[in-house]
């Protein structure tokens, strides 16, 4: 899946009332996806 889709899935799964932090999204993606994590892709997907 694309980073955009992974970020969207993480935000929906985390269900944080005040929004999900970048750290929480990163942790969720690392735990649930089998990809090599790239920080700059996460930042781009969040914009």
From Swiss-Prot:
Domain H15: 1-47
GO cellular component: nucleosome; nucleus
The entry's keywords: Chromosome, DNA-binding, Nucleus
PROSITE patterns: H15
GO molecular function: double-stranded DNA binding; nucleosomal DNA binding
Gene3D superfamilies attached to this UniProt entry: Winged helix-like DNA-binding domain superfamily/Winged helix DNA-binding domain (1.10.10.10)
Record flagged with keyword Nucleus: yes
Record has Lipid biosynthesis as a keyword: no
InterPro entries noted in UniProt: Histone_H1/H5_H15, WH-like_DNA-bd_sf, WH_DNA-bd_sf
Main function: Histones H1 are necessary for the condensation of nucleosome chains into higher-order structures.
Family designation: Belongs to the histone H1/H5 family.
Protein name, entry field: Histone H1A
Organism of origin: Olisthodiscus luteus
């Amino acid at each position: 899946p694309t980073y955009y889709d992974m970020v969207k899935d993480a935000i929906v799964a985390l269900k944080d009332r005040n929004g999900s932090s970048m750290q929480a999204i990163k942790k969720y993606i690392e735990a649930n996806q089998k990809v090599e994590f790239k920080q700059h892709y996460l930042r781009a997907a969040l914009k």
